[in-house]
Amino acid sequence: MDPMDIVGKSKEDASLPKATMTKIIKEMLPPDVRVARDAQDLLIECCVEFINLVSSESNDVCNKEDKRTIAPEHVLKALQVLGFGEYIEEVYAAYEQHKYETMQDTQRSVKWNPGAQMTEEEAAAEQQRMFAEARARMNGGVSVPQPEHPETDQRSPQS
C-alpha cells in the first residue's frame, strides 16, 4: 500500500504514538527481553498496516450494508473475512469493557456536574447570575444593575 493511499495523509501522519507503542511492546514481553529500535519501528509499521487493512475491510462491509458509519459489528465481520476469526471473542470483550468504562465515566461526569441536570430556565438564570458576578468584578466590585430585558428598556442614557 502506498503511504499516500491513506486518505491523502503522508506516512508520518498515519502512524501510532511511539512512546505508547514502546510501552505496549515492553508490557507484552518478559522484563529481561530488550527490543531494538528498528524492531520497534517495524512492529509499529505492522500495527499501522493491520489497522489500515481492518479499516478498509470494515469500510467494505459497511458499504455492502448501505451504511455510512462503520459500526463495531462491521469491524468484527471484517476480522472474520480477513481470517482473524479467532480474535473476535477477545475483541468483542474489549469492546464491551470499553462501553462499560465509557458509561461509568459519563455517569461520574454527570454526578460531578450538577448543571447537566438543570432545566433550560435554571441554566438561563444561572448564566445571568454568573454574568452579573463577572460584571461586578469588571467594575471593581461595584454591582451595576442590568435591565431584565435590555431590548425593551426605555431609559435614556445618563450623561
Swiss-Prot record:
Cellular location(s): Nucleus
Compositional bias segments (type: Basic and acidic residues): 148-159
Region (Disordered): 135-159
Alphabetical list of CDD domains matching this protein: HFD_Dr1
Entry keyword annotation includes Metal-binding: no
Domain of life: Eukaryota
Disulfide bonds listed in the record: none
Primary residence: nucleus
GO MF, one annotated term: transcription cis-regulatory region binding
Keyword Transcription: yes
Biological process annotations from GO: regulation of DNA-templated transcription
Annotated keywords: Nucleus, Transcription
A cellular component term, taken from the record's GO annotations: nucleus
Protein family (similarity comment): Belongs to the NC2 beta/DR1 family.
Protein name: Protein Dr1 homolog
Taxonomic path: Eukaryota, Viridiplantae, Streptophyta, Embryophyta, Tracheophyta
